[in-house]
Amino acid sequence: PDDWEMLYKIYAETSVRDGFAIRDESYYKTVWSTFNQPETLNLPTCEPLIAEVDGEPVAAIFVFYFGERAYYVYGMSTTNHRNKMPTYLLQWEAMKRAKERGCTVYDLWGAPEIFDESDDMWGVFRFKSGLGGEVVRTLGAWYYAPNPLWYKLYTELIPRVLDVMRSFGKKKT
């Protein structure tokens, strides 16, 4: 989209506020260009939805479409006007658009393993559960380590790598 700089800045603010790591802006541009190919029938299309208050962008989400499924993949919001709950409005709009496109499933993509308030993802789960629907467990994401030595090195470096990735968000806020 034309609003990359603004969207990434809001995403960076969200990552700093909520303490999660993000990738460099070029990663998200690659994801966008890879999946936003409506002329290719085998790939989903995607769209950003942006909420504004008095002309000020305050929240955005990215929704990906594939067949009869819509996927909520990335969400972001500023600290301004959070009391107006723009992220809920965006989800509602995304669900309406998905239905208009013939989607029968709107996938909120991700929940904690155990539903416990001490879990780092509890706030995300609380937000998503407030939208209705049901939790559907799937196989999920897995790591395959063809070389255990490299994997051990990788897993020991992860905290440092995540710190660097978190710094991407701090640089943009």
Predicted features and spans:
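Active-site/acyl-donor-binding loops of N-acyltransferases
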Residues: 108-173
